[in-house]
Amino acid sequence: FFVPSEISGGMQKRAGLARAMALDPEILFFDEPSAGLDPISSKLLDDLILSLRDNLNATIVMVTHELASIFAIGSNSVFLDPESKTMIAEGDPKKLLKTSQDERVIKFLSRSKKK
């Protein structure tokens, strides 16, 4: 038996997912789910989120800045312009990386230094 303060951040996140699963949701919302996790734990969490999506047949809505998660989980991503607070692109991130005409989207997805 553990109290929340005694378990790792990754275990706390998995416990949160277990609580959400108990409700058999149609939509799961995640806000920066891998924040504070090491890359291996982040990948495991991404895999768990994908498994939940498939097993629960649930829609996933996720806010993240993690490129690995965007490409692993995102089949339809929305990109927002922080200055105008408007949507600047929407679609599969892998396709947007190749086809977007918006340099901000390309820069974000490639993390390039181009201007």
Where do the protein language model's features map onto the residues?
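Conserved catalytic motifs of ABC-family nucleotide-binding domains
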Residues: 24
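H-loop/switch region of ABC-family ATPase nucleotide-binding domains
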Residues: 64-65
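Conserved beta-strand-loop-alpha-helix hinge in the C-terminal portion
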Residues: 83-108
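Catalytic Walker B motif of ABC-type/P-loop ATPase nucleotide-binding domains
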Residues: 28-31
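Conserved ABC ATPase signature
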Residues: 3-7, 11
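Helix N-cap at the start of a conserved alpha-helix in ABC-type nucleotide-binding domains
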Residues: 39-41
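Helical segment within the ABC ATPase nucleotide-binding domain
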Residues: 43-55
